[in-house]
Amino acid sequence: MSGLRQLATPRPVAVRTGASGVPLALERTRVEAVAEDWVVDDRWWTDSPLRRRYFELVLTNGRNAVVFHDLVDGRWYAQRA
């Protein structure tokens, strides 16, 4: 199918956060700014709910990244880095 794009599979990533839970560094690269953040809360009615806090980050190396904190298992993942 043309025009469709496959979503990037999330991969585990090391994130250092501040006291409020906002990312300060992704792997070894510092975060310059948080462009946007949002929460996805889905499948709450099932045995495997999905609850994630997403962050679109601007890194000090000039790249953008989208990461999320899985609020169910406590781990961090990169959706786009």
Regions flagged by a language model, labelled:
Residues 1-81:
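Non-catalytic peripheral regions of nucleotide-handling enzymes
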